[in-house]
Regions:
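N-terminal short secondary-structure element
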Residues: 1-30, 36, 65
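A short LG(V/I)-centered, amphipathic sequence patch enriched
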Residues: 41-58
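Alpha-helical linker/hinge and terminal dimerization helices associated
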Residues: 43-44, 65-87
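Central regulatory/effector-binding core of bacterial HTH transcription factors
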Residues: 88-153
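Secondary-structure junction motif
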Residues: 102-105, 182-219, 286
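Hydrophobic hinge/microswitch elements
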Residues: 134-137, 204-263
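Flexible hinge/capping segments at coil-to-helix
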Residues: 156-201
Length: 302
């Protein structure tokens, strides 16, 4: 029979792709991890891993077991937080990197400080946010989605018992760094071919392959991208202290009360960008995630 220790070892093996690396983070030996995984496979009658020359890869059955295991360990964690005073309420959220979202999360926490909510917030790209919600690691995920990618996203979500609700529609914007000579002069958009850019890491659901420049060619063919990052802190610092530009959904401007970005709307944009919330539909959303979703929805609709 599979026990909790084996499940914890299994999660570590899947996420590290190595028995030895899993042993390192679990403070045990590689032999112990390997034996535990072998025993788990025999107990379940399944091959959970393909043993490769350089590591391990979960099989299709292994990936399915991984999702169930994440859910089990989440429930175990919830049980461990039950005390005599009642059950601790947890909010688990993942999101694309966003300064305005961070500001609103702080506001939500402060407004509900006396309720003693416990929170977990994770920032990453669209694919990782989807996987975390799928694997029961987070209650809800907030992402930006190109309009023409909606059908592909719906397919991905549907096969994993998930769906999304649109919250806001925005345009693609050019953000100029404060050291650029045209900063503060928003009368016309400077030539994109003359700029150097800092851009977020992209994925298949949020990319710039339909955004056109002033001559009708694709922006991706014009842009000189000098810096690529997944950190909103790096993005903010570079825009404040360099002449780099950034093309993103109109999201940074939500934080203009705190950081004064010079923004210009791009021309020739036929595709809009949606800000959406994704969640699992095979279980009822708990009250706290629903409360946070309503809070964010009210903010973006202001």
């Amino acid at each position: 029979m599979t026990d909790l220790r084996q499940l914890q070892y299994f999660i570590a093996c899947v996420e590290t792709g190595s028995f030895s690396e899993a042993a390192r983070i679990l403070y045990t030996t590689q032999s112990s991890v390997s034996k535990a995984m072998k025993a788990m496979e025999e107990s379940m009658g399944l091959l959970l891993f393909e043993r490769m020359p350089k590591g391990i890869v979960p099989t299709a059955q292994g990936r399915k077991v991984y999702r169930y295991t994440c859910r089990i360990l989440k429930e175990v964690e919830a049980l461990n937080h039950i005390s005599a005073s009642g059950e601790t309420k947890w909010l688990r959220v993942s999101t694309n990197p966003s300064s305005w979202f961070a500001t609103q999360f702080v506001s939500f926490y402060n407004q509900n400080y006396e309720k003693n909510y416990h929170c977990q917030v994770y920032t990453s790209g669209v694919r990782t946010v989807m996987e975390r919600v799928r694997d029961y690691k987070d209650d809800v995920g907030f992402i930006y989605l190109m309009e023409h990618r909606e059908q592909g996203l719906q397919y991905e979500l549907g096969k994993n018992h998930m769906e999304f609700v649109p919250l806001h529609q925005v345009d693609a914007m050019l953000y100029l760094g404060e050291q650029h000579p045209d900063y503060g002069d928003s009368r016309e958009v400077p030539s994109l071919s003359s700029l150097r850019f800092i851009q977020n890491y992209q994925d298949e659901f949020l990319n710039d392959d339909t955004w056109e420049g002033e001559d009708g060619s694709l922006l991706s063919e014009q842009m000189d991208v000098s810096v690529v990052t997944n950190s909103d802190y790096i993005m903010q610092a570079m825009l404040q202290n360099t002449d780099l530009g950034n093309i993103s959904p109109d999201g940074l401007s939500h934080s203009d009360k705190f950081i004064n970005h010079d923004t210009m709307q791009l021309e020739n944009q036929e595709q809009s960008v949606q800000f959406i919330c994704i969640f699992r539909n095979d279980q009822k959303m708990e009250r706290l995630p629903k409360k946070f979703l309503t809070f964010i929805k009210n903010y973006v609709m202001e």
